[in-house]
Amino acid sequence: DASAKFQPPEQIPQTRFKPAAAPHPPAVMPDIFAVLEESTFDPKILQACNGQAVCASALFKGSGSGREAGPLITHTTAGGTALSEFTFLTGLDWRIFGPGGALAPLSLASHMQATLPKHLQTLGYQTIAIYPVGRNFLNAREAYRYYGFEHFLGIEDLDLGSDWHSLRDGQLFDKALGAIDKMRD
């Protein structure tokens, strides 16, 4: 049986995406900011939601942890942030890898060859990731290195302490913008 002798290649070359050539001559390029603002808040707990149709919407129903099987086929409330990040940065839905895909940032990030940060670098962009929790949370620093970010800053790097549960968006954005200004090429 030939399948018993099959040896997978050390690295499977991707053919889906081709790196773009850097613009010549270098053009003034706009800054690109992508902000993942997830909701871990279930609106059904509000008294104002009692009897309101929008609060009973199928968008807030799912069949599992993180509601990842909802009608939008995306996380709707609570959980799955690292999976949303993986999907956005790689262009791959983690579910195509089966149950093991639920650990994509831990088990698959190191195998990603064509990612959004790497593509942006071929266009001449500097890539900086600002992580709103501890840099080692769910191995984020390593995953983001594999995704191709040149710089990765967790809340420790922004002097925001370690209590990310009480961190306000405004605090994070102020510190992040200050750090980005210092790091610009």
Region annotations inferred by a language model:
Residues 1-185:
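Soluble catalytic regions of membrane-associated enzymes that act on cell-envelope
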